[in-house]
A protein has these predicted regions:
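Catalytic cores of the polymerase beta-like nucleotidyltransferase superfamily
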Residues: 5, 11-149
Length: 149
């Protein structure tokens, strides 16, 4: 995704036009810069994408990466001034940043899940972006925008 400095950012998706506010563009640039520094494929996912398609304002964004989400959150936090606290949940491989204006940013590593026949609790292990998307239900959670393309 080519991120440019402007009052808003427009991304063209086949048959769709998605517009980002100046604040959203700034956040996306910082996450994209951190992902590039770490060399991890990263996608904006879920409700944020839905809200942008519908032309709604947002107050949070979720990202999935093909790698260490906690490391990506830590690298992203360094892009802000002041540097926000990174809350992480090592058991789940997730992290959270709240920037100074109250905007929440969540990070999760791509994963795949498998189930034993007698259990509803998944066995979780790191996976590819494709495996992560395949495990999601076919609703809002499966929407994604690449930060690299």
């Amino acid at each position: 995704m080519n991120l440019v400095s402007c009052a808003f950012l427009v991304i063209f998706v086949p048959f769709m036009e998605i517009t980002f506010s100046q604040k959203e563009s700034m956040i996306l640039k910082k996450v994209a810069r951190a992902a590039e520094t770490l060399g991890v494929e990263t996608f904006l996912i879920g409700g944020f994408v839905r809200d942008k398609i519908l032309g709604r304002e947002t107050s949070d964004a979720d990202f999935v990466c093909a790698g260490d989400a906690i490391l990506l959150a830590t690298e992203t936090a360094k892009q802000f001034n002041p540097v926000p606290q990174v809350d992480y949940f090592r058991n789940f491989g997730t992290a959270h940043i709240r920037i100074s204006d109250g905007f929440d940013i969540e990070f999760v590593g791509a994963r795949k899940e498998s189930y034993q026949l007698d259990s509803r609790k998944p066995e979780v292990e790191p996976g590819s972006i494709e495996e992560d998307q395949a495990r999601r239900d076919f609703t809002i959670n499966a929407l994604a925008i690449s930060l690299q393309k």
